[in-house]
Amino acid sequence: MFDIKKYQGIFPAFYACYEDDGSVSPARTRALAKYLLDKGVKGLYVGGSSGECIYQGVEERKTILENVMAEVGGKMTIIAHVACNNTADSQELARHAESLGVDAIASIPPIYFHLPPYGIAQYWNDISAAAPNTDFIIYNIPQLAGVALSIPLLQEMKKNPRVIGVKNSSMPTQDIQMWKDEGGPDFVVMNGPDEQFISGLAMGATGGIGGTYAVMPELFQKVYNLYQAGEMKLAAEIQNEICRIIYKMCSARGNLYAVMKAILKKHGMDIGSVRKPLPALVDSDLAVVDEASAMIDAAIAKYC
């Protein structure tokens, strides 16, 4: 029987950490894991969209997870996203993740070809079978995967006893309510869209996994704690400021993750840039980095 408390709280989506030459950096990976552990977050979501997984090979993804686990394994909840464009590689990453002792694995549906629901279920169950002693979390992100989770598909997946929840990155918060209602009180549903974290909590989310959490974990933790304490007005005020920060970061020409990595560098955490084809920063983006960084610092000083 799994412990739902392991999945309650803030889970930064872990960023890809590269050397200056673009290769995966074990040292920087460990440094970022330690940095986030010290921030007091509940856990990490490793190898997902924010980790640039679709631009990495299987061995690179193994290296990243190995170094995260070596640094913080057993000290926080670790969810490893293991999906690849083919089942065999996904199963290899699932077996590897289980061998390292992660708390859960997760997977998006197969991308590019839009498979029927029974094909998606087979893909997920094949991955889960490769890690039979590890919790499995469905990752619903239809705007990028091209296919969406449905109640019938969730009902089919619930026949697998390892399936404990959904990471929901679809935009309607109603989806969170539907997955939670179908899954029951001990079913994990994680809010995905950072801009509506407080709304996701209100609809029943257990916690959140977010791509911007790592650059401002203090603010998301404050929103979560205030929500749990029933202080909704202040929680909403901070959520609105988080949204303004995200909008500012998204105003750059370079990719959002390049912006956030530059902000982390300003705070002493150099994890490199993004991997092509994600656009790197251009000179005009430096002002955006400075402004967003100042907004984060000011919000933390005001609210945390």
Residue ranges and their predicted role:
Residues P12, S25, V46, S50-I54, ...:
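Short, flexible micro-motifs
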Residues F2-A148:
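Active-site beta->alpha loop and helix N-cap motifs at the rims of alpha/beta catalytic domains
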Residues A130, P142-C243, R253:
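Catalytic alpha/beta core domains of metabolic enzymes, predominantly
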Residues K6-C17, Y35, K39, A205, ...:
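C-terminal alpha-helical cap/extension of soluble enzyme domains
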Residues K39, T63, N67-V72, H96, ...:
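Alpha-helical structural signal in soluble globular domains
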Residues T29, R61, L65, S90, ...:
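A general structural signal for well-ordered alpha-helical segments in protein cores
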Residues E52-C53, F113-H114, Q174, I198, ...:
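Short secondary-structure capping/turn micro-motifs that flank functional sites
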Residues Q8, K42, V46-S50, V82, ...:
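Short glycine-rich loop/turn motifs that provide flexible caps or phosphate-binding loops at active sites
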